[in-house]
């Protein structure tokens, strides 16, 4: 069975990103973006997915974290899409509901070739988390879902602490990814015979 992995390098005037992803890993994760909360969220998602991930990013954090986080999302999605190839034989769908103290989030995905982010309940998030606007996390997942060509639904059900809500969603994303990328059968899981 071939190893599902990918390496991505992206260099722009705003960011420089290098990452290596192994889908069938052991949860060995090393992330350095220069923005601690992004490192934490990405580490949680990759660990709970069982991925091995090495990621380094240098970005224009003197402006804010937007370019860094969005570009990292794009690169992560690109790496996942490349590692999965034609997506033949994967379970394709995954979902998880994860608590973190008082917070609860639902995450559902379909690695269908149809990019979409549905982002609900973000009014529960405080306007600023770790010094950045809450919209940053929607942009991160929008970039990830688009580049990975997946349908991604994140719903914050309840909670008061922004960190806890994001952690709940990050773990949920990881668990949903673990289910969706699982090798399930030899054929493409689609009645139409295509995932685009």
UniProtKB/Swiss-Prot annotation:
<dbReference type="GO" id="GO:0000105">
    <property type="term" value="P:L-histidine biosynthetic process"/>
</dbReference>
<keyword id="KW-0963">Cytoplasm</keyword>
<comment type="pathway">
    <text>Amino-acid biosynthesis; L-histidine biosynthesis; L-histidine from 5-phospho-alpha-D-ribose 1-diphosphate: step 6/9.</text>
</comment>
<keyword id="KW-0456">Lyase</keyword>
<dbReference type="InterPro" id="IPR020565">
    <property type="entry name" value="ImidazoleglycerP_deHydtase_CS"/>
</dbReference>
<comment type="similarity">
    <text>Belongs to the imidazoleglycerol-phosphate dehydratase family.</text>
</comment>
<keyword id="KW-0028">Amino-acid biosynthesis</keyword>
<dbReference type="GO" id="GO:0005737">
    <property type="term" value="C:cytoplasm"/>
</dbReference>
<dbReference type="GO" id="GO:0004424">
    <property type="term" value="F:imidazoleglycerol-phosphate dehydratase activity"/>
</dbReference>
<keyword id="KW-0368">Histidine biosynthesis</keyword>
<dbReference type="Pfam" id="PF00475">
    <property type="entry name" value="IGPD"/>
</dbReference>
<dbReference type="InterPro" id="IPR038494">
    <property type="entry name" value="IGPD_sf"/>
</dbReference>
<dbReference type="InterPro" id="IPR000807">
    <property type="entry name" value="ImidazoleglycerolP_deHydtase"/>
</dbReference>
<protein>
    <recommendedName>
        <fullName>Imidazoleglycerol-phosphate dehydratase</fullName>
        <ecNumber>4.2.1.19</ecNumber>
    </recommendedName>
</protein>
<dbReference type="InterPro" id="IPR020568">
    <property type="entry name" value="Ribosomal_Su5_D2-typ_SF"/>
</dbReference>
């Amino acid at each position: 069975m071939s190893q599902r992995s990918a390496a991505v390098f992206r260099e722009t005037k705003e960011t420089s990103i290098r990452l290596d992803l192994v889908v069938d890993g052991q949860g060995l994760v090393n992330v350095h973006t220069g923005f601690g909360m992004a490192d934490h969220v990405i580490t949680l998602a990759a660990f709970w997915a069982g991925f091995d991930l090495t990621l380094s990013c240098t970005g224009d954090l003197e402006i804010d974290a937007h370019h860094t986080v969005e570009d990292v999302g794009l690169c992560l999605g690109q790496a996942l899409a490349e590692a999965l190839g034609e997506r033949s034989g994967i379970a394709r769908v995954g979902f998880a509901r994860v608590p973190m103290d008082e917070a609860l989030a639902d995450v559902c995905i379909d690695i269908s070739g149809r990019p979409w982010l549905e982002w609900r309940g973000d009014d529960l998030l405080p306007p600023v988390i770790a010094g950045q606007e809450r919209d940053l996390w929607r942009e991160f997942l929008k970039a990830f879902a688009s580049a990975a060509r997946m349908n991604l639904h994140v719903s914050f059900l309840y909670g008061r602490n922004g960190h806890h809500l994001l952690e709940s969603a990050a773990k949920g994303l990881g668990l949903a990814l673990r289910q969706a990328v699982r090798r399930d059968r030899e054929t493409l899981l689609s009645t139409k015979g295509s995932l685009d």
